[in-house]
Structures are given as C-alpha cells and as structure tokens.
Amino acid sequence: GEAPSDNPPYHMDPEGMMGRASPDQIRSVWLGWLENLASFHKINYEDLELSMIDKRSNESSHLHSDLQYYKSFMEWGMDGEANAFLEEVLLWLSENLPLNPNPKKLCWGDSRIGNVLFENFQVKSLLDWEMATIGDPLCDLAWGLTTDDVSSHGLNVEKLPGSISNEEAIKFWEENTGYSAD
C-alpha cells in the first residue's frame, strides 16, 4: 500500500499519492479514513481485554486527565520557563471541557491519514499505534483534522481539491458513531 506523505506534507507533494490523485480519489481517501475511524470507535475495548491501556482509569474525566498530562509535559519541556500563550490555551481548555464527554472508547492516538495505507485509494491498514489509549473518541477525530489543517493552512497552502471539510467530517463521524463533537 501507499500512505499520504508527511515530508513534504501531502498538500504540497505533487509526486505523492495525494498529489497524483483526482478530487474523487482524494475524497475516497478521506471517507475511508472516517469510515474506519467510526468503526474503530464502536469497538468495545473491554471485550478485547484492552483495559490495561487505560492509563487514566481512576480519573473521573479522561479529558481532564489529558490536560493535566499536557500541562506537566509543557512544564517539563519548558524547563521552568513560562509560556503565556500555552498557559492561556490550557486555562481556556480546562474552563471549556465538555460537560458531557463521550463514553470512554479505544482511541488510536495518532489517527491521521498519513498513518493509513491505501491501495487504489481504499483503506488497507491503519498504522502507528504507540499512542493508543482509552479516552474520548472525539480526540482521534480532532487529531486527524488538526494535523490536516496544520499541513495545509498552517503552511499557507490550500487543501487539495476533493479534501473533505472539517464540518463535513464532523457530521459524518457523528452520524456514524452516535457520539457528539460538541
């Protein structure tokens, strides 16, 4: 199979899989990613005896636990130096956590189209599982859409024709999982 390139990002790689693709093929890649993500989020991890990857089993909110992890990681990485912007972001996030998060599910962790192998623009394999955890499945959707935004708008590059909009992706995911992206 073949995966959308990371370096250069697929939105900037005319020789890569996505650069050679038609808009319909690019749409097929995105829909395949979303279909697999939605199916994955329906798996009952307890039936598979995967509860051992639930690093936050004693936390009342897995999203709160994630924020605490990233705050600790930031403090470690900044080596005692303050970063007003990141502190403001963490404060906003902690004050705006969803009141009713989705049920805890198996999460891929690095759920982006660059970690999917395709054959003829159809999903063949999902890769890169070292970030897998138990948490809010919305985090997987957000990660995939955010990494796409960073590799396009974040680099002042237009998304490829056929790319799915964030709004369409969210609607598809909600309809196919029964979970909320609010």
Enumerate the predicted regions with their spans:
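ATP-binding pocket architecture of kinase catalytic cores
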Residues: 1-88, 96-103, 122
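Glycine-rich "substrate-gating" loop/helix at the edge of Rossmann-like oxidoreductase active sites
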Residues: 24-26, 129-133, 160
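Active-site activation/catalytic loop segments of kinase-like enzymes and analogous catalytic loops
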Residues: 139-179
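An acidic site on a long C-lobe helix of protein kinase domains
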Residues: 29-33, 82-85, 110, 137-140, ...
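Generic alpha-helical secondary structure signal
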Residues: 61-65, 69, 84-88, 118, ...
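Short, surface-exposed acidic
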Residues: 82-83, 178-182
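Active-site acidic catalytic loop and adjacent metal/ATP-binding pocket
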Residues: 39-42, 79, 88-140, 145
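Alpha-helix C-capping/helix-to-loop hinge sites
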Residues: 73, 77, 126, 148-151, ...
